[in-house]
Amino acid sequence: LDAAAPGITVRMERELDARILTPYFTSHFWWMGNGDEPLCNWTSWCTQNVLLTVFLLPTTQQQRQAAVKQAAYSLDCFLKDYGADGCCNEGAQYYRHAGLALWGCLEILSNVAPDAFRPLFRETKIKNIAEYICNVHVEGPYYLNFGDCSPLAGRCGAREYRFGQAVGSDALCALAAEDFRADADPDHLQNSDATTHINLWYRLTTAFAEAELRTYTLPQPEQNTVWY
């Protein structure tokens, strides 16, 4: 990057420090959690993106430890608002910024401290959060909707597939693989929700999972009745 635009990496690091790292370490925002107040998808979504920033930049060990501590606390506050059934009370359209961003947080934390965080994927509640999107799927691109949630909640793909692998869910892996193959725009370049394609980590996750998604053997679907 510096060869093409001298000084750009220094500018990027300076802006990320000013806009993300310094505010995160010196201020308290409501989505970080502070007791019993209800939280939403902002918590997991913002926390995921902060963690990406912290661990991709040449941050100090002290900053990294502080980020892990705050992220773990924020996710505890986020999870308190989920029942054991894993229902996303914001609906299917918000799943990708709520439950799926929770996967992003845990995936990053598991790579940083695998012994501490990887076992969390074996928790029943985490698996139920992962499989919520399967349980409200109707057919093709359609989902059960309520509130301000669209019935066209967007296709599943690589992140759902990796979440399914992490929690041991054949149903989620199958839905993700089937949806990815059926998607005429798997890179989401035409999606009006720009958050699905401007995140380079999402794009890399898709790139590294594409071969698996295209060759995954789809099991016979199970007929389950789920109540939320």
Predicted regions and their residues:
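Carbohydrate-active enzyme catalytic cores, enriched for enzymes
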Residues: 97-228
